[in-house]
Amino acid sequence: MNVKDFDFYLPEELIAQHPLEQRDSSRLMVLDKKTGEIKHKKFHDIIEYLNEGDTLVLNNTRVMPARLIGEKEGTGGKIEFLLLKRIEKDRWECLAKPGKSAKVGRKFTFGEGKLKAEVVEVEENGNRIVEFFYDGIFEEVLDSLGEMPLPPYIHERLEDRERYQTVYSKENGSAAAPTAGLHFTKELLQEIKNKGINIVYLTLHVGLGTFRPVKVESLEEHEMHSEFYMLSKESADIINETKKRGNAVISVGTTSTRTLETIGDENGFVKEQSGWTNIFIYPGYKFKVVDKLITNFHLPESTLIMLVSTLAGRENVMNAYEEAVNEKYRFFSFGDAMFIK
């Protein structure tokens, strides 16, 4: 298949620049993957589509304030580091801007010296391995000095950091939010539990590769970035019991989906596991674990719209996206949601 098969017209004004005041007041498009039928709802109505005994799978990763803006020791020249992933205790793989300043051996300082950094390696892809020096706990230092790494298509400043976190975020490590989960409130999750639906958590730390465009024409040639995931025995057991009963496993977001499909065996069962995944799900792939999906509206030609098209059918998805544009749905991270049933 060709990348162009997943292109669609999107007016720029439909790209949501800020979250809605009430998380679950966003719109919800319900798409029947068998018939292609579309219904327009509010996100809170999702509960109507979840049945007793079903299991909802959420990604509890937490976005780090991973943008650090500082200066070069000696000259005061400006530098920006974006932390991508931890290599070992105080060494991180980072994007550096401007790259020419971040040579091996160069030292930088942040927050009037509260945090210092030295570039120890330049990788083939241009990323830097950076060692950090500080007093206390790194996460606390980062929390006080770092900024949220918002996606490149969001141009407005985020007033409240917590609006780019899910209400159940727990495990620090992401460079971007698992945005399908942003629509849930604590009250809605409690209502879902009260209806007899299981809620389980896994962790996948979202990397910046999620925003990288597909640069090859043929999907078969695209290589995904690797991301760290973790599924507990408790969550795995509940998912397996759900499959045995014939109930639905409903994945919240493409990140939860990619984790479940990485771990799942040919019978759709999962086990306690952690590791790195670079699974790329595109049409032709047969889902093993995930039956239904809650997701946002994605970028044209992105790996995310390809995953969604694999579950619901490309034609159904492209029709649904055309209708979403006509109905002026809000797109991308702070936008509206879709439920594929």
Swiss-Prot record:
A Pfam family of this chain: Queuosine_synth
GO function term, MF aspect, one: S-adenosylmethionine:tRNA ribosyltransferase-isomerase activity
EC category: transferase
UniProt-listed Enzyme Commission number(s): 2.4.99.17
Metabolic or biological pathway, per its Swiss-Prot or TrEMBL entry: tRNA modification; tRNA-queuosine biosynthesis
Protein's cellular compartments: Cytoplasm
Presence of keyword S-adenosyl-L-methionine: yes
Substrates-to-products reaction catalysed: 7-aminomethyl-7-carbaguanosine(34) in tRNA + S-adenosyl-L-methionine = epoxyqueuosine(34) in tRNA + adenine + L-methionine + 2 H(+)
Major place of residence: cytoplasm
GO cellular component, as recorded: cytoplasm
GO biological process: queuosine biosynthetic process; tRNA wobble guanine modification
Summary of the function given for this chain in its UniProt record: Transfers and isomerizes the ribose moiety from AdoMet to the 7-aminomethyl group of 7-deazaguanine (preQ1-tRNA) to give epoxyqueuosine (oQ-tRNA).
Family annotation (HAMAP family): QueA
Subunit structure of this chain's protein: Monomer.
Family label: Belongs to the QueA family.
UniProt name for this protein: S-adenosylmethionine:tRNA ribosyltransferase-isomerase
The organism of origin for this protein: Clostridium beijerinckii (strain ATCC 51743 / NCIMB 8052)
